[in-house]
Amino acid sequence: MDKLTPSQWKVINKSYEPASTIKVIAGPGSGKTLTLLYKVLHLITVENIKPEEILIFSLTNKAVDSIIENLLSIFENSHTNKEIVHQIGCYTVHGLANRIVVENEGMINIIEEIGWRGLMKLLPPSKRTPHHFRSYKELEKVVKDYKLNNAKNNNPVIEKLVELMDNCKVMTNDDLIIRAKKYLELDSSDSDASSFTQDLRNKYKVVLIDEFQDLYPSLAPLITMICKGKQLIMFGDTNQSIYGFLGSNNEIMSQLDNLHPKNSTTVLKLFDNFRSTPEIISLASKIINRPLAEKQIIDDTDETPSELVRKLPSGVSPQIMTFDDLAAESEFIIDKITQLICSSAKFSDIAILSRTNSHLTAIASILKKYGIPYQKLKSQPDWMDDLRIQFLLDILKVCSLASDEKHNREFNTGDKWQSNFSILVTMSALKGIGDASIQALYKACSLKNLSIWKYLTMVPNFEWPLGLSIKKKMENYTSNLYEMIENDQVHQLDDPMELLEKVASITNNLNLNPTYFQSLSDAQSSLEFKTHLQEMAQVMKVSKSNKPPGISFVKWFLETYFDQTMVFHQSQQALQTTGPGTVKLSTIHSAKGLEFPIVFLTNGSMSNFPMDTNALYVGITRARNLLYMCNMKHERLVSKSSPYSRNIMSNNLFWTYYNKDLKRSVCDVKVTHGYNVQRYNQLRKNFGFYRAYSSLRGCKSVFRRI
């Protein structure tokens, strides 16, 4: 068992009580996640809480993956059957909401970028009207505001779009939360209620929330309903709250703090720091203006200073620098990575964090030029964000939904055709299909109370209100999908690869508008698409392996691919290999809950915006041993470091400290120093770093040889 601190044991040993709250205030690197994991172990092995009575919430898929992986390790190390970990409910809030709604409604659409683009095709073209939008982001905001105001703002165009979304079961993430709450509110004695929904009401006894500071108001209705009457255990740090743009964290925390009586609420604190060096902690404390006096620590906790865990000083302070342009900043980062790799660091030790994805994209292109392997970290898998993959999913939805609807032609259900949305989205991506054609077709379908698919396959084409060239494109669309829908082939194909090949073949024949997606002519973009397609195929195979009887494969996959992606990622954890790895690129928001031995924190030389205090604090506290800060604009930061220092190369004491901290061998640090310097000098000569300043040039991938 891991060596736990007195403050951690206080949390772990706090006994189970129904309708109670334990709030654990835990700073970065305080062992919060480890405490949560051992609390779960304690509940099962000591408190006799069944694993299926425990529910864990986090906000990101990466955090859920990490919790499950670490639970498996802890249960195995404690000689407890690790298979019971899979009986514990561990979800993102939206993942759980999605499962509730799908279980009660069947297939739904969570609207993504490609969906908003499709909806924009239905908007009138006049720029003089109040419903003209320059981007799908503007439309998304207006629709959200319309729903929040309960349709009080008189806008018939938005009203029609929202009606279409409702009829086609198209939901935003906020809609998902509201809809899930509605099903939890239903009478549990209702015989039609689904078992998972009943379990959330009745089975779970303990709910643990990881990173409570990341919660925002729209999540409150669902979370408070689930947690009421159970033991609620929350872990978090208000200094790391960086989702203020989604609403005030204080609002939802006030509801959770008052969920149970005050005499049933306990607040505990973790002040240890297992992660960052004292030098990094000192800078982080300065940023949030928190004094480090031991008196404050003693006042806030029962531990004495000698009981609190702190790492020894490393002797290396964070470096704070300012650069005039991206070239100078990037050259510094490349040069410093060269020094670090030529010492004792691995690529996998290094993370480059920024506030924006656009700045990370610029840095990624430069890393690629130098042959430095990198990986972008995101809140959800890349394949699910790829517009081309989203299009394939929408084609599958068209086929599945339209095939189901053709059996109901005798029923006059008006405009409530769920396939309409996916058809509009996929048609919007076809070359030569403009807004006017989409609007004319949709209006004609509405007048006849037919779905778009039924209209195109039942109404003679001479009645279509479309030009000849557009009619041909529509006929090509229907002819390519006809066999899948009208012959029910989509529900008969049971092999994931056959289904994917069929959908890919259909897509290839549809004459897509290349400007609707990322350019497929670019080699890197094509390679990314191939990678994402392979991952989608793997998730489909996972879905096939656990498909229950009585449901077609395509329907099962489309209803559960969010959950199946989680299963796939968990299975991949055990397959990770050792080696130099990759440099991690991430926004500060996506790096929440993660740590890295070495962090480059960059804001971009062209950014005139000061860094938000909490975001800067989160970025700083991701670093374990080394921190380099580039163009960080903040009132409590002063740029004072020289970007041309090579001192880290010769600091044997630090590299001994570094390798001990990461539990690596330290015997070769001194012996190989001379060779490392020689290797670095050769690399910097190749790259042009021997000058005080140089512009970036096309370089060979020299790093692949080291």
From Swiss-Prot:
<feature type="domain" description="UvrD-like helicase C-terminal">
    <location>
        <begin position="278"/>
        <end position="593"/>
    </location>
</feature>
<dbReference type="GO" id="GO:0003677">
    <property type="term" value="F:DNA binding"/>
</dbReference>
<dbReference type="InterPro" id="IPR027417">
    <property type="entry name" value="P-loop_NTPase"/>
</dbReference>
<keyword id="KW-0378">Hydrolase</keyword>
<keyword id="KW-0496">Mitochondrion</keyword>
<dbReference type="GO" id="GO:0005739">
    <property type="term" value="C:mitochondrion"/>
</dbReference>
<keyword id="KW-0238">DNA-binding</keyword>
<dbReference type="GO" id="GO:0005524">
    <property type="term" value="F:ATP binding"/>
</dbReference>
<dbReference type="GO" id="GO:0000002">
    <property type="term" value="P:mitochondrial genome maintenance"/>
</dbReference>
<keyword id="KW-0472">Membrane</keyword>
<keyword id="KW-0234">DNA repair</keyword>
<keyword id="KW-0347">Helicase</keyword>
<dbReference type="InterPro" id="IPR000212">
    <property type="entry name" value="DNA_helicase_UvrD/REP"/>
</dbReference>
<feature type="domain" description="UvrD-like helicase ATP-binding">
    <location>
        <begin position="5"/>
        <end position="277"/>
    </location>
</feature>
<dbReference type="InterPro" id="IPR014017">
    <property type="entry name" value="DNA_helicase_UvrD-like_C"/>
</dbReference>
<dbReference type="GO" id="GO:0005759">
    <property type="term" value="C:mitochondrial matrix"/>
</dbReference>
<feature type="propeptide" description="Cleaved upon import into mitochondrion">
    <location>
        <begin position="693"/>
        <end position="706"/>
    </location>
</feature>
<dbReference type="GO" id="GO:0043138">
    <property type="term" value="F:3'-5' DNA helicase activity"/>
</dbReference>
<dbReference type="Pfam" id="PF13361">
    <property type="entry name" value="UvrD_C"/>
</dbReference>
<keyword id="KW-0547">Nucleotide-binding</keyword>
<dbReference type="GO" id="GO:0032042">
    <property type="term" value="P:mitochondrial DNA metabolic process"/>
</dbReference>
<keyword id="KW-0999">Mitochondrion inner membrane</keyword>
<feature type="binding site">
    <location>
        <position position="275"/>
    </location>
    <ligand>
        <name>ATP</name>
    </ligand>
</feature>
<feature type="binding site">
    <location>
        <begin position="29"/>
        <end position="34"/>
    </location>
    <ligand>
        <name>ATP</name>
    </ligand>
</feature>
<comment type="function">
    <text>Required for mitochondrial genome maintenance and mitochondrial DNA inheritance.</text>
</comment>
<keyword id="KW-0460">Magnesium</keyword>
<dbReference type="GO" id="GO:0016887">
    <property type="term" value="F:ATP hydrolysis activity"/>
</dbReference>
<dbReference type="GO" id="GO:0005634">
    <property type="term" value="C:nucleus"/>
</dbReference>
<dbReference type="GO" id="GO:0000725">
    <property type="term" value="P:recombinational repair"/>
</dbReference>
<dbReference type="Pfam" id="PF00580">
    <property type="entry name" value="UvrD-helicase"/>
</dbReference>
<dbReference type="GO" id="GO:0005743">
    <property type="term" value="C:mitochondrial inner membrane"/>
</dbReference>
<comment type="similarity">
    <text>Belongs to the helicase family. UvrD subfamily.</text>
</comment>
<protein>
    <recommendedName>
        <fullName>ATP-dependent DNA helicase HMI1, mitochondrial</fullName>
        <ecNumber>5.6.2.4</ecNumber>
    </recommendedName>
</protein>
<keyword id="KW-0227">DNA damage</keyword>
<dbReference type="InterPro" id="IPR014016">
    <property type="entry name" value="UvrD-like_ATP-bd"/>
</dbReference>
<keyword id="KW-0413">Isomerase</keyword>
<keyword id="KW-0067">ATP-binding</keyword>
